[in-house]
Amino acid sequence: MQHQLVVKRLGRQDYEPVWKAMHEFTDQRTEETPDEVWLVEHNPVFTQGQAGKAEHLINTGDIPVVQSDRGGQVTYHGPGQLVAYFLINLRRKKLGVRDLVTTIENLVINTLKAYNIDSAARPDAPGVYVDGKKICSLGLRIRKGCSFHGLALNVNMDLTPFLRINPCGYAGMEMVQVSQFNGPSDVETVEKQLIEELVTLLDYERVEFSTEAPSQGNKA
């Protein structure tokens, strides 16, 4: 199972049902459960991470705010943004948390490089940046040696809701996206490149694709 990966393409989804399904998957997985990556575009929502502070919500207006249990502070999700959730058994992969963060950042950097977009990570603020402007946010949670939550890569979206918050707790943090650097404007194209890079970086040999929505069981 160490080299097997299931990739689920979930399409457009509200945040909370997917969040609850991630919890359930992580709670129920065993040592034999293959790792999964869930690819999704969320309907408009602000999510507060565990370090989130109310003062970073400037004017949320009609966009809902959800208190999440991922690391980090506030961010925005909306259509045209690629969200990837990494449900990985870190012990089985022999990865530490810092290793996983670095791997995810490199995953995005390599994906953007395929479109001739030069980007970099920052030691003081997780995520990926182009000329100091944020193109990808990152927030994770670890339970029972397994990760959940993940990244949000801006592809071709309305960035104005980011002006209603201090993204990731940084006042004036400018957000950018793939399409403005002559990269693809459709999320699906970027998804394919991202998964190719992930399979290489984390040494998966068997990859199964699915559009089946994750089960939420009886959780409310």
From Swiss-Prot:
Question: What's the further remark here?
Answer: In the reaction, the free carboxyl group of octanoic acid is attached via an amide linkage to the epsilon-amino group of a specific lysine residue of lipoyl domains of lipoate-dependent enzymes.
The residues that the entry says bind substrate are 70-77, 137-139, 150-152
The SS bond pairs are none
Is the keyword Acyltransferase assigned to this protein?
yes
Q: The BPL/LPL catalytic domain covers which part of the protein?
A: 31-206
Main function: Catalyzes the transfer of endogenously produced octanoic acid from octanoyl-acyl-carrier-protein onto the lipoyl domains of lipoate-dependent enzymes. Lipoyl-ACP can also act as a substrate although octanoyl-ACP is likely to be the physiological substrate.
Q: Which family does it belong to?
A: Belongs to the LipB family.
Name of the protein in question: Octanoyltransferase
- Record keywords: Cytoplasm included? yes
**What species was this sequence derived from?**
Vibrio parahaemolyticus serotype O3:K6 (strain RIMD 2210633)
Database matches in PROSITE patterns: BPL_LPL_CATALYTIC, LIPB
